[in-house]
């Protein structure tokens, strides 16, 4: 990644004729919003490099083909019989498909992706090949994924999309992610671009407690929000509590906010005390959703975990377990 960072990736695609755009959260997409454009650019790039594809739509690999690597020779100087530093005991000389056909090669590059979103072809095949060569796997878990919450309020607001809000992810009370953008309430928890970005910062959920804290009005300070609420309530003086929130919050959130606020829904806006308005300010600026789990691998954008990077040379991406075997991309941890 140091030699080929995201900026160079963008330069590559632009050189291949793909016009790019950068959206909030530093997310990069083709201007056309068509994934097919990326696919075609990569196919052209491969064709220009004289890459030849197997005729099968999908090549099912059964195993890597290893051969024993000769032991390093001793020094030719008899007075200093030091052995050369021992390297991998195996050399990868190809792969074998489930049909039994062998593909012999000077080098094998495993770039099969992770195990998330299997409908795109990422079915975890590369992990099996890596293990055959003696590699250790870091347990694959979903990343860039929706988050599951047992909070019943999420289901009550299912389908509500929030724009221009700030999501802060708290780990044991400490902020580990903070970003402004869009998110969505679902029947199982929260989703959307902000949620996906936040999910990549989650650690071991068995060891830590996570809370998503949402600032529904990040453009306003607490004092500015208090003044805004006071003005709204003055204009809607004879409205009940929920009706008084009509200018402040989306309709599907209004009854949920009143319930969490703990105020009698029949209370008129002109009866709401200063203290109650302060409580409302805190709820709007610090709406909390407990996070109980990550979404499943089948719907994750990427996989965290995979082939241990300790067993791969970072300069060449060659396996430290078998010469001629290389790894690239999401198959790695």
Where in this protein do the model-derived segments appear?
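Conserved N-terminal/central alpha/beta ligand/cofactor-binding core
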Residues: 1-49, 185
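An anion/pyrophosphate-binding glycine-rich loop and adjacent beta-alpha core
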Residues: 19, 135-141, 148-268
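Flavin (FAD/FMN) cofactor-binding core of flavoprotein oxidoreductases
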Residues: 28-32, 143-152, 294-311
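A glycine-rich dinucleotide-binding beta-alpha-beta segment and adjacent secondary-structure elements
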Residues: 52-55, 255-333
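A conserved short coil-to-beta-strand element within the FAD-binding core of flavoproteins
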Residues: 52-70, 76-91
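Short hydrophobic core segments
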Residues: 102-118, 130-131, 183-186, 325
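Glycine-rich phosphate/pyrophosphate-binding beta-alpha loops
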Residues: 116-118, 146-147, 190-193, 302, ...
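Glycine-rich beta-alpha-beta "Rossmann" dinucleotide-binding loop(s) and their flanking helix/strand
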Residues: 118-138
